Amino acid sequence: ALASKATGYPLAFVAAKLGLGYGLFDLKNSVTKTTSAFFEPALDYVVCKIPRWDLGKFHGVDRELGSSMKSVGEVMAIGRTFEEAIQKGLRMIGQGMHGFVGNKELVIEDIDKSLREPTDKRIFVISEAFRAGYTIDQIRELTKIDKWFLDKLMNIYQTSKELNKW
């Protein structure tokens, strides 16, 4: 469902028709109604799907995330870059945060421990770790999060630092 929503390409419809024996050239593009469905969607945007956690409403619930589903919903954020999309998504998840950076009400007693534990707040802990001087490699070692994502989050943090100079 996310791929169809994000691309505008009717994957389920096309897959069903292919299963019935139609070819891609037989199917019409649902948008143009003239060209065939044999095309690759050209996207100039990035989509981030972020689970919405509401663990504070449930008493006694462990905040650590694992294989069991604890999300109460999700947001789908769209932007020209990953940085823009993740910022939009983090603002929409309803945790009272201002995005990746600028969350002064977040209290972290032990950054290393908070980075190691996969919780609903860990992405915001990463921002605090950057502020405390942690490097991308240090955070990667503690979280096991791919460096590509940490580089993008560092871009947001650096941009915030630049804007705060003004």
Spans of model-derived segments:
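ATP-dependent carboxylate activation and anion-phosphoryl transfer catalytic cores
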Residues: A1-W166
